[in-house]
Regions:
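ABC ATPase nucleotide-binding domains
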Residues: 76-82, 86, 90-233
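Helix-to-loop junction immediately C-terminal to a conserved catalytic motif
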Residues: 50
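ABC ATPase nucleotide-binding domain
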Residues: 5, 25, 61, 339-341
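Conserved ABC transporter NBD signature motif
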Residues: 58-69
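Glycine/charge-rich catalytic "coupling/switch" loops of P-loop NTPases
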Residues: 255-305, 329-352
Length: 352
């Protein structure tokens, strides 16, 4: 049985549908990221799950019981969920220990159990040596750990996280990504994590839910959404792909600027119709001197390049601009005429 189920969940504001009839099921212990650009509806979805917003339509279920419907709504305090906000929202006048223990105090947990649970969480979040300090004496990463420990103190079934790392610098974000996932695996609760950051989603999630304009575009593992995007939006948003406009000739062949390409996977529009293909930057070959170029090659010229240590990125004009990642030792001057070879089995058709 799914731990969390959203059925036809909808939220409207004047002039806009923020969340548009989405369906989603999340299993016990799963880590799911809601990923998308600003305004796509991901935070609104999270706030409806938490009970801070009431849906206009649809239902929310937890462990088979309906907690939100058009006729009845379970209040937030009875949902056995915890939420971590972008601002952390820890109490500045309380010590680390007092902050972590506050939810247990509100639940009137016995003193001995409270101390035991707080001690365990302080150890798990590596805050045991900071227990008597105040938030103003902590780094941003330590404050985030306090928010995590406090959220876990009531032993929630579901942990909701709303852009929790956006206020941290890049190095701390990297550390905290692994820390959040480590705690998830240790305590085995269900996590719903909202982010606009593709790297966060790819490194943390069991599954990624990609949202756009209030709707779910694609659901899949990090590998699935990266390797097999089902739309032009997903391919562009996840990144690492070239998206090119082509004309479908028939079968698995397309026309790119007057040159035929075989496409190994994906969906295709009707013959003669315009469509898109996507191909990863590392799945395209740059041939400075191809001789007889062979199949699935198109001519182009180098517009620009960037040396990035481990590789070089080339921008090549093939009637459209394409980005190609090649080994660092491959050096081709700007303006050079080249051939670009597309690996058919790595090219994906996008009918929409």
């Amino acid at each position: 049985m799914a731990n969390l189920a959203l059925r036809n969940l909808t939220k409207r504001y004047p002039g806009v549908v923020s969340v548009d009839a989405i369906d989603l099921t999340v299993d016990h212990g799963e880590f799911v990221c809601l990923l998308g650009p600003s305004g796509c509806g991901k935070t609104t979805t999270l706030r409806m799950i938490a009970g801070f917003l009431e849906p206009d339509e649809g239902e929310i279920g937890v462990d088979g019981a309906t907690i939100s419907s058009p006729t009845a709504v379970v209040p937030p305090e009875r949902r056995n969920m915890s939420m971590i906000f972008q601002s952390y929202a820890i109490w500045p006048h309380m010590t680390v220990r007092q902050n972590v223990g506050y939810p247990l105090k509100m639940k009137k947990i016995a003193a001995a159990e409270k101390r035991s649970r707080v001690d365990a969480l302080l150890a798990a979040t590596k805050l045991d040596t900071q227990a008597e300090r105040y938030p103003s004496e902590l780094s941003g990463g330590q404050q985030q750990r306090v928010a995590l420990a406090r959220a876990l103190a009531p032993k929630p079934d579901i942990l909701l996280l709303d852009e929790p790392l956006s206020n941290l610098d890049a190095s701390l974000r990297g550390d905290m990504r692994f820390e959040i996932r480590r705690l998830h695996d240790k305590f085995q609760y269900t996590s719903i994590y909202v982010t606009h950051d593709q790297v966060e989603a790819m490194t943390m999630a069991d599954r990624i839910v990609i949202m756009n304009a209030g709707r779910i575009e694609q659901i899949g593992t990090p590998e699935e959404v990266y390797e097999r995007p089902n739309s032009e939006f997903v391919a562009r948003f996840i990144g690492g792909s070239n998206v090119l406009k082509v004309k479908h000739i028939g079968g698995r062949q397309v026309d790119l600027g007057g040159h035929l390409l075989d496409i190994g996977q994906g969906e295709f529009a009707g013959s003669g119709s315009s469509m898109s293909i996507c191909v990863k930057t590392h799945d395209v070959e740059l041939l400075a001197d191809a001789g007889a170029p062979g199949n699935n090659t198109v001519p182009g010229f180098v517009r620009s390049q960037a040396y990035l240590g481990s590789h070089r990125d080339y921008v090549v004009d093939v009637s459209q601009e394409i980005l190609i990642a090649v080994p660092a030792h491959v050096a081709v001057p700007n303006g050079s005429r080249v051939w670009v070879r597309f690996k058919a089995d790595r090219c994906r058709g996008l009918a929409h």
